[in-house]
UniProtKB/Swiss-Prot annotation:
It is a single-pass membrane protein. This is Protein translocase subunit SecE. Keywords: Cell membrane, Membrane, Protein transport, Translocation, Transmembrane, Transmembrane helix, Transport. The lineage of its organism: Bacteria, Bacillati, Bacillota, Bacilli, Bacillales. PROSITE patterns: SECE_SEC61G. GO terms for biological process: intracellular protein transmembrane transport; protein secretion; protein targeting; protein transport by the Sec complex. The chain crosses the membrane at residues 30-50. Its main location: membrane. One of its GO terms (cellular component) is plasma membrane. Essential subunit of the Sec protein translocation channel SecYEG. Clamps together the 2 halves of SecY. May contact the channel plug during translocation. Pfam families: SecE (PF00584). It is found in: Cell membrane.
């Protein structure tokens, strides 16, 4: 019975949440994807640079 009360309470709280509208959600999604792509490229270049540096030191 406690689990049923828990889920009812969760439902009540979820109705109180202020969910983003369509344009706002799209803007947030684009921001997140752009940030992820930036960091993927950044760390790939950093990894390549460090690998090349280590290769030069070892040789």
């Amino acid at each position: 019975m406690r689990i049923m009360k828990f889920f009812k309470d969760v439902g009540k709280e979820m109705k109180k949440v202020s969910w983003p509208k369509g344009k706002e959600l799209t803007r947030y999604t684009i921001t997140v994807i752009s940030t992820v792509i930036f960091f993927v490229i950044f760390f790939a270049l950093l990894d390549t640079g460090i690998s090349q540096l280590i290769r030069l030191i070892v040789e």
